[in-house]
């Protein structure tokens, strides 16, 4: 039996491959800090992209983008700040928050899905 973690990892890898096909360079998967986790950290040109991956088997469970609520955005923002601080990225590094939604077999990317949340 496959657990949720294994399913999530599989879709994160699939999302990473999708991002790379669209010019991103994946730096890291599943970066964790005490504040939480970011699914994918990647470079897209000059941008450091913090990417949340959401999967739904079908639309009955709702739109995957809806799962990235304000609370989740705050968590991702805090972890992104910690990542930049601990990996030598300064205040001048352009960053953004993207979301990859997987609905069944369809993958959709929203760049700059949300702004930094305090």
Over which residues does each language-model region extend?
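Hydrophobic residues on conserved beta-strands that form the core of alpha/beta folds
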Residues: 26-28, 50, 97
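Domain-level recognition of nuclease-like catalytic cores that cleave nucleotide substrates
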Residues: 85-118
């Amino acid at each position: 039996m496959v657990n949720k973690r294994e399913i999530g990892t599989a879709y994160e890898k699939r999302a990473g491959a999708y991002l790379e096909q669209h010019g991103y360079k994946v730096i890291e998967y599943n970066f964790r800090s005490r504040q939480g986790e970011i699914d994918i950290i990647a470079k897209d040109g000059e941008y450091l992209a913090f990417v949340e991956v959401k999967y739904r088997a079908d639309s009955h469970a709702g739109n995957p983008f809806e799962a990235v609520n304000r609370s989740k955005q705050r968590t991702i923002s805090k972890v992104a700040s910690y990542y930049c601080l601990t990996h030598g990225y300064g205040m001048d590094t352009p960053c953004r928050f993207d979301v990859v939604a997987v609905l069944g077999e369809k993958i959709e990317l929203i760049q700059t899905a949300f702004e930094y949340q305090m």
